A protein has these predicted regions:
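Extended catalytic cores of very large enzyme megasubunits
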Residues: 1-718
Length: 718
């Protein structure tokens, strides 16, 4: 009988999930049924309470002794914290993600040994020093108001709690031993589910003389081929293959070959199919593109100081080397820029990140010699690196959609959430396991954190603000400022309680300059924060970074980070199959107007999730529910530029162009540079095939295709 009930329930779950396209309310129905199934599966292993879950996972060797002892000592209090009804907040696909990928399982039977609320409380206890602290963080997670990034969710309380999302490695020195040492570091970091960013700018270019052998170098490509194979071979904690992004400065003489690494044509021996690529672009290059001037390419062996310079110092040194004839060759700047745009158009890769903007305002670059050489795998982390220090960041994101009340943002609640999030992100620095000594040294000296957001599109839909409206720009900017104010204030409080980060004296904050001071006139609120920082210092050198959040946004049931929606109808994949999902805000509006019919659903799927050409949809809804492909990309750049004063690291900013051309891309990225953006992320383009004809009853119906090319993402940041 039990087996029959289980089969019936699974069929009911699949049926409800399949009906989400007709009515998004079916998502909650499917989620409740799945929650029952999870509870029964855990109960079959004797797990009904949180303390029983911890006992079972500890017996299975999955969690550390200290956590098991803490829970055993406070079992009654912790069991009483669990709110089983909080499972009702999940959408089906969010709960399915938790079940498939996050809940701890018995090593042999693979049955889950914790329920979703046990999972959240386990993560909270793994980061807490008391029951009260655990209750505080659990309250945020159980209401889906805030979630740490995936490494923390995977590993909090585990025997090896690798809690960090991102690792950034400076370029190896131009020596055989240094290069192979970097390979080893990357492998160890990738083994424990870290997303890797690495510069390769210091390594000599093709044709460079090797004095020890009197031969000539083959350049960076063979080294990157080896790195590519290593990254693919070392999978992340047994969950997926590793992921890395290589950064190269635009003056490196191998830049043109670098831009071809992801091409699908040409000599395969000079291609890398796993590495992501990013350009680390100085202002001098962009100025020469604007002026249609020549650009000089150098062998880093001949100009070893360029990689450690930025701003005016870089420009002076670059021009001096150029005047001295030290360049390998010259090329029209616009020709090279065009090749960069071609790489973006064809692969979505070769991301544009801006060296001078990244360094100019960073709190970490207050002392000469402290230089940011690259960003991370998702371009939202900007931290100082050196041979002795691998930059690290611990991430978490606030669900903005969970902070709405009475037709607006609940600012007091948002500030409270920020304060809690900052304290627990700081805690991860001390509790985390570090795969390399260089990572531990950097993280404990600088103590950077990356607090971000998700669900901005949900806020705009709820408040009926078109993404490119002046009101949306104003609200987005205020949200960023309020989060930064609360984060800096909290970090100053932590400094008073627990001490400043050890490198505080090297930062701009120690000289009285906070990140917003580089952009805007101070307000009374910032004056108060600045005074507190002057008294107490800061616990963390950096605080704000907007990560992609694809996975945790799915758990929270909101749209990713700061992005607009890609489509009003989209595919969700789970281990049990693929399902279509629909924009629930659009459906609610159409239902209220009596327009949500089967015919309209079919029209929406035929239109690739766009409402723009569907007859009968009111104009106000067409404006509000535009997709990323239908919004002016200038608006996305303007939103990012307006919030940047309050983001002391950076933001994962995808840009969207259905049919990219070199001319359009050239203008778009030049505009991003002029607006002072520090980084950009993927260029998203539509595939040639049509999207989403899945359940439309036509003889030639095709399975829904992914709406984005280049779907690789860094799970660590999510």
């Amino acid at each position: 009988m039990t087996q029959i009930i289980e089969v019936d329930r699974r069929l009911a779950i699949e049926e409800a999930a399949a009906r989400v396209i007709a009515d998004p309310a079916n998502s909650r129905v499917a989620a409740r049924l799945l929650a029952e199934e999870i509870a029964d599966e855990a109960a079959a292993h004797g797990v009904r309470t949180f303390s029983e879950s911890i006992a079972a996972t500890h017996a299975a060797g999955l969690i550390q002794d200290g956590l098991a002892e803490f829970v055993a000592a406070h079992a009654a209090e912790l069991d009483a914290l669990v709110r089983a009804e909080a499972d009702d907040r999940f959408e089906y696909f969010g709960l399915r993600t938790v079940y498939d990928r996050y809940l701890l399982r018995h090593p042999e039977t693979r049955a889950v040994l914790e329920r979703p609320q046990h999972f959240f409380l386990r993560v909270a206890c793994g980061l807490s020093e008391s029951v009260a602290e655990a209750a505080e963080l659990y309250a945020l997670m159980s209401t889906l108001s805030y979630l740490p990034s995936s490494p923390t969710l995977f590993n909090s309380g585990a025997r090896r709690p690798q809690l960090s999302s991102c690792f950034l490695l400076d370029s190896p020195r131009d020596e055989l031993e240094a290069i192979y040492d970097r390979y080893g570091q990357v492998a160890r970091l990738s083994k424990y589910a870290g997303g890797i960013g690495i510069s390769w700018t210091r390594v000599r270019s093709r044709g460079s003389l090797i004095r020890g052998t009197n031969g000539h170098s083959n350049g960076i490509v063979p080294w990157l081929r080896t790195l590519d194979s290593s990254v693919a071979a070392v999978n992340q904690g047994g969950r997926r293959k590793g992921a890395a992004c290589v950064y190269l400065e635009t003056w490196h003489a191998d830049i043109e070959e670098f831009l071809e690494l992801r091409d699908n044509t040409g000599e395969d021996a000079r291609r890398t199919h796993n590495l992501n690529l990013a350009n680390w672009v100085p202002d001098e290059f962009m100025r020469r593109v604007e002026a249609d001037e020549v650009w000089s390419l150098f062998d880093p062996k001949e100009v070893p100081d360029l990689t450690d310079l930025y701003g005016d110092a870089f420009t002076r040194a670059y021009r001096a080397y150029e005047a001295a004839g030290r360049h390998v060759r010259q090329i029209p700047a616009r020709t090279l820029y065009g090749r960069m745009m071609r790489t973006l158009a064809q692969t979505g890769n070769g991301w544009m990140t801006f060296k001078d903007a990244a360094n100019r305002t960073s709190n970490q670059t207050g002392r000469p010699g402290n230089v940011i050489h690259l960003s991370n795998l998702c371009t939202e982390i900007l931290e100082v690196t050196s041979d002795a220090e691998t930059a690290v960041c611990n991430l978490g994101s606030i669900n903005l959609a969970a902070h709405l009340d009475d037709g607006g943002v609940d600012w007091d609640r948002l500030r409270t959430t920020v304060r809690t999030a900052v304290r627990f992100l700081d805690r991860t620095i001390d509790l985390g396991f570090y795969p390399t000594p260089e990572a531990e040294a950097a993280n404990k000296r600088w103590r950077p954190i990356g607090l971000g957001v998700m669900g901005l599109a949900d806020v705009f839909f709820t408040l009926r603000l078109p993404f490119d409206s002046p009101e949306a720009l104003e609200l987005s900017t205020r949200i960023a400022e309020e989060i930064a104010l609360a984060a800096y204030d909290t970090s100053a409080d932590l400094a008073a309680e627990r001490g400043r980060h050890p490198s505080y004296a090297e930062t701009r904050a120690a000289g009285g300059v906070l990140h917003p001071d580089h952009y805007v006139t101070g307000t009374e609120q910032w004056d108060a924060v600045r005074e507190k920082v002057a008294r107490s210092g800061l616990r963390n050198s950096l605080m704000i970074a907007i990560a992609p959040t694809a996975t945790i946004a799915s758990i929270a049931g909101c749209y990713e980070c700061i992005e607009p929606q890609v489509s009003n109808v989209f595919k969700r994949e789970t281990l049990s199959g693929e399902f279509l999902q629909v924009n629930r805000y659009l459906v609610a509006d159409l239902q209220a107007r009596g327009l949500w019919t089967q015919q309209l659903r079919d029209d929406l799927k035929r239109a690739d999730g766009s409402v723009q050409t569907i007859p009968g949809i009111p104009d106000d809804l067409k404006v509000l529910y535009r997709t990323a492909w239908e919004l002016p990309q200038k608006a996305l750049i303007d939103l990012a530029a307006a919030r940047q004063p309050y983001i002391d690291q950076s933001q994962s900013l995808n840009l969207f162009m259905a049919s990219p051309t070199i001319g359009k891309l050239s203008s778009m990225y030049a505009y991003a540079w002029k607006r002072g953006l520090k980084t950009t992320y993927y260029l998203r383009s539509r595939p040639a095939t049509r999207i989403a004809q899945t359940t439309v009853q036509t003889p030639s119906a095709e399975a829904i295709a992914c709406s984005l090319e280049n779907p690789e993402t860094c799970e660590a940041c999510q």
